Amino acid sequence: MTQPDPTPPIPIADDVGDPPWRVDGLADSVMILLTMAAVQRIAGFLRAILFCRWLDPEQLGQWDMAFSFLLLAAPLTVLALPGAFGRYVEHFRQRGQLRTFLRSTTLTCIGLLAAGTTVILLGRRWFSGLIFGTPDESGTVALLAVSLVAVVAYNFSIELFTALRNVRLVSVLQLVNSVAFAVIGLGLILGWRASAVSVVIAYGAACLIAALLAGWRLSGTWQSIRPAAEPLAARPFWARFAPFAGWLLMVNMLANLFEVIDRYMIVHYSTMPTSEALAQVGNYHSSRVIPMLMVTVAAMLGSMITPHLSHDWEAGRRREVGHRLALFLKLFGFALVLGSTAVLVASPLLFGWAFRGKFDGGLAVLPWTLTYCSWFAMVMIVQNYLWCAEKAYLCSVALGTGLVVNIGLNLLLLPPLGLLGAVLATTTANLVALGLICLFLARMGFPFDPGVRVVLGLPPVLCLGPWIAMSVLVVVAAEAALGKHLLTPEERDEIAAGARKYLGRLPGFHRVWTA
C-alpha cells in the first residue's frame, strides 16, 4: 500500500502563470544544446588531444586523478543540493516561493563549501596520499582546494539555469568554460611547464570565469522573481527538499565513484610503483578521451530534460513522460553506438599520430571503454524517470550494487590483467547497474518496447570490431525505418515532424518540405 506523504501540501499560487524569464521548450532545448555542445565538444576534444600529446603518461595520469577528486568533492561538499534544482525549482515557482527556495539553498551551500574547503586544506597530506598514492603532492592538493570553490560555483550556476529552462545561457556558460580551459591550459603547458599543476590551475580559472558570468546574469533574473506572498516555513520546506537531495547525493556519489573507482584501484591495489600506476592511469585516460565526451553530452542532455519531464509529471501527464523518454533513449542510444563505431575506425590515426604513439595500452582497451561508457550514458538518461517519480533511492541501489561488483572484480582481475582487468571490471559493473535500473523502471510501468531493448543491447557489438558493428547498425536502422518493431508509426511521425520543423528553417529546405 502506498504510504501517505507526511509533508503538508503547499498551495499553488493562482496567478503564477509563465515565468518572466525566457523559457526554452524541450525540442528547442535539445537543438540548442546539441548545437552549442558540438562547438564545445570540438574545443574539448582538441584540448584533450593536445593534453595527451604534450603531457607524458605519468603527468596525464596525475591530472586524471586530480580531476577525479574534484568530481567527487564538488557535490559532496554541498551535499548535492544544487543537483535537486531540476526537480524542485518549478515546484516552488508554481507556488510563488522560488525566491525563498533559492535564498535558503544558496546560503546553505556557501556554509558547506567553506567547511569542506577548510577540511581539505588542513588535511592536505592525507588527501595527497588518497588521490596520488603519495603524501608528496600536498601543494597540488592545496591548489585543488582553491579550484574546488570555483568548480562548485560553476556547477551551482549550471544546475540553476538548467532548472530555469534557460538552455541558451547554460550552453553559453559551458562553452565559455570549455574554451577558457583550453586556452589557459594550453598556454600554461606551453609557456610555463607541462605538468598536471598547470592543468589544475587552468580548470579552476575556467570555472571561475564562467561562474562570474553566471553571477552577473543571475542578478537580472533575481529581480524578475516576485517575492513570496507568504513566508515558506523552514520545516515543511526541508522536509520535502532534504530527503530527495539526500538520495540524490547518494546517487551522485555512487555515479561519480563509478567514474573514478577503477583508477583509484589501479593506484592503490595494482602492486605497481606509484609512478608506473599513474602512467597506467594516463593510458586509461587516453582511451576515455572520446567516450567521456559522449558521457558528458549524455549528462548534459539528461540534466536538461529533467525540468521538462518534471513539468509534465507535475501536470499529471506521466504516461507521456515514459513515452517521450523511451523515444529519446532509442535515438540517443543508437547515436552513441554509431559514434563509438566511428571512433574505432579512426582509432589508429588518433593513437598513432595525434597521441604520438605514447598510449598503446589505451588503444588496447578502447572497445571495452566505449562499451561501458555507452551503457553509463544510457543510465544518465533513463534515471530521469526515477527522479520524476521521486524514487532516486532506486538509482542508489543499482549504482551501489554495481560499485560493489566493480571493486570485487578489480581485486580479482587487476593484479593478473593490469589495465585490461580494471576495464573489464568496470564494464561488468555498468551492465549490472543498468540492468537493475531497467528492472525498477519496468515495475513502475516504463514502456520497454522492442526498440528500447535493442538499443540497450547494442554496445557489446563494439568489441567485435568496427565493421561488424557497422553492419549490425545498418540492419537496426533499416528495421527502424521500414519495420514495425523498433519504432512505432507514431514515433516515426514525431521524428519526421521534428525534422521538418528544424530543417525547414534552413535556406533551401523550406521549399522542399512544403512542396
For the regions a language model picked out, list residue spans one by one.
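Transmembrane helical elements of multi-pass membrane transporters/channels
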Residues: 28-45, 177, 202-214, 218, ...
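Membrane-proximal transmembrane or re-entrant/amphipathic helices at the cytosolic face
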Residues: 2-19, 465-515
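Helix-loop junctions and terminal segments of transmembrane helices
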Residues: 78-94, 163, 287-329, 383-388
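Membrane-interface junctions at transmembrane-helix termini in multi-pass inner-membrane proteins
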Residues: 150-174, 367-401, 443
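Interfacial segments at transmembrane-helix termini and the short loops linking adjacent helices
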Residues: 26, 124-144, 272, 278, ...
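Hydrophobic alpha-helical transmembrane segments
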Residues: 138-142, 171-222, 400-406, 419-440, ...
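Signature of the first transmembrane helix
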Residues: 3-13, 22-83, 114-121, 147, ...
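Alpha-helical transmembrane segments of polytopic membrane transporters and translocases
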Residues: 49, 61-78, 107, 247, ...
